[in-house]
Amino acid sequence: TRTAYTKNTMDAYGLAEYHYSQQYLKFCGRRMELAQLQNFVEADRMFLWWAVTGQGGAGKSRLALEFLKRSHRDFFGFFLNYAVDPEEVRRFKPFNDTVAIVDYVKGNEAEIAVIFAILIDKFSSGPYKLRILLLERENTTEFGSWHHDLITAMAPYYRQECNDAEYNLELSTKNHRFLYLDDLDGAAV
């Protein structure tokens, strides 16, 4: 029964309690993916970006959250809303190696391009590493993809910076450009 003192966790569909941030379901599996994310943040370069891709419900956001929880001593990490006011991002002062995670890139490429530029400038002259991790369903770089639209939304300088700073590019293939979350196998569950 609901009273005035009961926290309302219901949304329009009654599923708010299952949102990844609630951590209602125990995180399981994805050891290899967590290790790949750890390698991403530990790489020697000062600025790198990468993406985690997979179908809706594959666990991209939960994986990123779990990674931040397990690695919080190594770097400062946070989810950054693509709709953040650019002035808020400009006020950020780097104080540690940092991982910024942006979910839902498709349709928000212009806003995210601005965020990239500001963060690149913020970290370019300091001693701290910057990692940007994008979460998106689509795993392609073809014309019209979120990747293509994001890169072309950037000013030429930042476009070159991002082209040079894509993590694991030398190991990628056309079908596996980014960290792709496939279905969990039975052993992982």
Name each region found by the language model.
Residues 170-175, 185-189:
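Conserved AAA+ ATPase core "coupling" helix
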Residues 1-123, 128-141, 146-166, 173-181:
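Walker A/P-loop phosphate-binding element recognition
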